[in-house]
Amino acid sequence: MTLREGLPLFHQQFTALFKKNLLLSWRNKRATCLHLFSSFFFILLIFSIEESSKASDLTSTRHKNVTDPKALVSLPILPCEDKFFVRLPCFDFVWSGNQSRRVTDIVSAIMANNPGRPIPTNKVQSFTKPEEVDAWFMSHPSQVTGALHFVEKNATVISYGIQTNSSSEKKRGRREDPTFKFLVPLQIAAEREIARSLIGDPKFSWDFGFKEFARPAIGGEVIISAFYLMGPVFFLAFSMFGFVLQLGSVVTEKELKLREAMTTMGVYESAYWLSWLIWEGILTFVSSLFLVLFGMMFQFEFFLKNSFVLVFLLFFLFQFNMIGLAFALSSIISKSSSATTVGFLVFLVGFITQIVTTAGFPYSSAYSIGSRVIWSLFPPNTFSAGLQLLLEATSSPGDSGISWSERAICAGGESTCVITTNKIYIWLVGTFFFWFVLALYFDNIIPNASGVRKSIFYFLKPSYWTGKEGNKVEEGSICSCIGSVPPVEHITPEDEDVLEEEILVKQQAMDGRVDPNIAVQIHGLAKTYPGTTKLGCCKCTKTSPFHAVKGLWMNIAKDQLFCLLGPNGAGKTTTISCLTGINPVTGGDAKIYGNSIRSSVGMSNIRKMIGVCPQFDILWDALSSEEHLHLFASIKGLPPSSIKSIAEKLLVDVKLTGSAKIRAGSYSGGMKRRLSVAIALIGDPKLVFLDEPTTGMDPITRRHVWDIIQESKKGRAIILTTHSMEEADILSDRIGIMAKGRLRCIGTSIRLKSRFGTGFVATVSFIENKKDGAPEPLKRFFKERLKVEPTEENKAFMTFVIPHDKEQLLKGFFAELQDRESEFGIADIQLGLATLEEVFLNIARRAELESATVEGTMVTLELESGIAVEIPVGARFVGIPGTENAENPRGLMVEVYWQQDGSGSMCISGHSAEMRIPENVSVIYEPSSQVLGHGQRRVRGIVIDYESNN
């Protein structure tokens, strides 16, 4: 199959990535709607605040021209409940002078003739003297609006006084005026009823009114509205929604290693960034358009009087600027959960700088050009300056705003003007390119999810542009105190097969000979991580480097499956990461179909011919399996006409046809692994990496996937890693076992079992009705002939492990055993090699022991005698200090049984009974101090080389 290249591939990748972004946005409807339509709620909020402000000022004439003020007449005494913050029970008024019958009648008339409502008797309190009223005030604060004090001096003279609280209260933005609300109504009522009493006419008309002076509007014609006060802050907050969503989307793909998976498939960086830029640009365009339309819909003069294009461009260019800033920050942020926090910080800084910009800094002739340049690099600053210009152009009722033709003209023709609307737009365009280029630069020099980065001067190196060698590893922090990564010391392999493989590869490399049957040739591959770096006070400190892979030499043939085994931390996944280009190598090289992994051109060719099923599923939860396959097939460069049929075939192969349109987020773990296997097989790759492909699958599905892998061997090489020894035994043509970064053994399954297994495994099954105790003669037969005891026995069968050195005796032994089947009651005899699991544990255990004796990694073995023995991890035969006596001059030892725990680490599963240490065995490891604690109940064990001597 011919894959697309160059511009056609770029176009195909861009289209697929753009469609992916569209689907993700469509399926995350809540976030997308928030991005597009949040402007409506901000505009509505501003409108509501402004209308509320206008409603509270309806009775105010402060901002109006008053030419013919109307008089206020017949003001009633208000209920006491109308007073702000009154205490209940309350009174409409209190009065003094109740010793006078005439005064009492006047007060009764005030209550009865109150305009609009008579005052109930229980809402009025009477006293004799003003002093009594004062005392009552002190004991009943805030329970009355005012007091009247009457004195009848003679038949024609009645004097009165009014007492009110002059303190002005404020409630819900409105201030209470005690003079006009309480004092004036009491004064009118008192004078009216006193006049009627003196005249003797209870119907006497008493008209009294007051009005303000005719005057112009206070403060000129400048209107200070909620829009002009709060609009800039709300517009900045509105822009943060899109900014946070853009930042979170890009960081999520980096955090989940989705971008890394696409890179492995050969995605162009240019197609990746352009797809994000165009899609986010479209969303920004639509959201900016809606903002302006909503502003016009609510009849804000800012949107109506200024040029539509000018207002739209300001919001669009600002939000487009924020896309560039989001891309730049995405290189620094490693967690998508941090996007909201970063968005809030950017808003907070933008809010502060907005206040400073509104105050005039630095866009005036009083400040230098340099300060304006630096200040304008932060998008919210130029946005605030542009908003200020457009707001000032519509701040007064007579202002006509700024038209398109006036965009380059200073407002009012000021000689001190240094910024115009046109310059604002030029700045916004320029700063977008600044942030976008910075984003691309940061993306290359800041460590990615795998800790890989380029040199800070990578763009100056010819190798970056030519793609030829010259590849220097750059990893970890940018801190300059990181030195060069130390080279891996070459260690001659102890295993004869590994040494033979290394010699063969070196000889082929030296001769320049390319074997057409070899798919992958690894030349001394090494990978070292420089360790973590911490910045302290005026210094950098770092931990020791970690050698993950220590000089790997081997060939991987075509049409074969090579299984790479090893415990956790052995270097398997790191090796695959180096071969797929995810991690750069520290030393050595590898040739995949003749292409070097150290060359960017070679790596580009390699990615066209490989497929990768990573250790952990790297999938979009919102995309279906069908959409995943279409996306990766397009990235790979498959012809568009073949993508649908290939995707359908792969779905059939992995049994996902019925779930093809279901989103991957709803899949089980096994279904996700099957989808990852299908993605790895897209485009008929010549080399497939399967990193634990059947993890989480049920047995039936696992068997089906094994069939797929077996069928996929033809015409390609497959590199498999797994923790299932059964899977490795069934699928692999060759097996390599790694431990502690080094290849410990290599060969076919039978070869490894014969070399590293404990020997042959014989299983003897008995006839069902065989009586109890009959197996004893059989046990004696094995003991006498082969010197072995059963490792497992019950009524149904016995299992014996026969050492390799007894191989010459087996033919005659089993011939005699078959002749005596009826004597021993034998139903069946099975003979086989040790399991691959046993081989793996032996190799892993030896590697752990090798490392533990150097690093001092210990575990505690609890013996039945109560002694606790500290032993190195991986030790098999352990001598117990303090058990020496005349009968056992070298003491006692136990055999320790090891297994892997759930995390893949070696742990103790049990131990044998204590046995005598033979005289002829040597010691592998002996601690300097053997006794720990009191009473010799805790000791350090001695590692015995019983295997070699036995």
Swiss-Prot record:
The organs and tissues expressing this protein are described as:
Highly expressed in siliques. Detected in seedlings, rosette leaves, stems and flowers.
Task: Quote the Pfam families the UniProt record gives.
Answer: ABC2_membrane_3, ABC_tran, ABCA11_C
What is its membrane topology? Multi-pass membrane protein
Q: Which GO terms describe its cellular component?
A: endoplasmic reticulum; endoplasmic reticulum membrane
Matching entries from Gene3D superfamilies are given as: P-loop containing nucleotide triphosphate hydrolases
Cellular localisation: Endoplasmic reticulum membrane
In the UniProt record, does the keyword Membrane occur? yes
Q: How is it used?
A: Overexpression of ABCA9 increases seed oil content.
Q: Per UniProt, which keywords does this protein have?
A: ATP-binding, Endoplasmic reticulum, Lipid transport, Membrane, Nucleotide-binding, Transmembrane, Transmembrane helix, Transport
Indicate the transmembrane segments per the record: 31-51, 223-243, 276-296, 308-328, 342-362, 426-446
Q: Name one GO biological process term.
A: seed development
InterPro entries on file: AAA+_ATPase, ABC2_TM, ABC_transporter-like_ATP-bd, ABC_transporter-like_CS, ABCA, ABCA2/9/11_C, P-loop_NTPase
Q: Which residues bind ATP?
A: G566, P567, N568, G569, A570, G571, K572, T573
Q: Domain named ABC transporter: which ranges?
A: 520-765
Q: What happens when the gene is disrupted?
A: Reduced seed size with abnormal morphology and reduced triacylglycerol content. Retarded growth on medium lacking sucrose.
MF term (GO), any: ABC-type transporter activity
Instruction: Give the SMART domains listed for this entry.
Output: AAA
Statement: the UniProt record of this protein carries the keyword Transmembrane: yes
**PANTHER family in alphabetical order:** ABC TRANSPORTER A FAMILY MEMBER 11-RELATED (PTHR19229:SF207), ATP-BINDING CASSETTE TRANSPORTER SUBFAMILY A ABCA (PTHR19229)
**The protein's role, per its UniProt record:** Mediates the transport of acyl-CoAs and/or free fatty acids to the endoplasmic reticulum. Has no effect on the selectivity of fatty acid incorporation into triacylglycerol or further desaturation steps.
Annotated family: Belongs to the ABC transporter superfamily. ABCA family. CPR flippase (TC 3.A.1.211) subfamily.
Designated name of the protein:
ABC transporter A family member 9
The scientific name of the source species is Arabidopsis thaliana (Mouse-ear cress)
